[in-house]
């Protein structure tokens, strides 16, 4: 007799995501006592504690964290199996990760077409750096991600979908930049570690023997552009982002060396793509 059922995993995942029994019960349309009983019975069958109390909430134990990855994968496979039997209609959920640049500029028209073509598919989009998105993909928190090169492909499947022109930006009115050596002792304004564009800029500096004075880590392109415009430092970003940025006209653009001027964004995923992801891949192929 199996100790784990899909219903067990569904209830467990809901409690883990919501961080408490009351919120999970509301989402599951169950009474809280029923959810509590199901979790206790599940823990008893497994012989291990999955949650522990933290104030008014519950948090996962080490065993719970391990189970969550399996639960995400098994529930997704169950959804995919159900989708495959729905007369070819693409339905279910598609959890995407994306760089902020792609999410704000490249993806809106694509997601709009996808939404119109597949109304029974629920799309979730979250943003992050390339490294952060690859970790979420490895932890089964997302189904696919739009990431920038360079990245460690490993066993992932990948397809190049966008080509971005990268530019160096400085405050308006500053001197002409002829190379990385002209930026000695400058502050680099960038996303935190894990950003591929930051890595490209740092590698360019290192090749020229230049050491940035310091780094200012920010969480959005709007903040980066504003700080550069105020004279804080220099940054690297896609020209398409600047074209749509609120303060895009308040900075000075500089061409980068040809070898690093163009950067590709890839859609990456693990394993065989399910129905919703296959539909997105087809849409990207047709629209290429």
Q: Which stretches of residues belong to each language-model region?
A:
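Flexible hinge/capping segments at coil-to-helix
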Residues: 153-193
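Alpha-helical linker/hinge and terminal dimerization helices associated
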Residues: 45-46, 67-88
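A late-sequence structural motif
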Residues: 106, 252-288
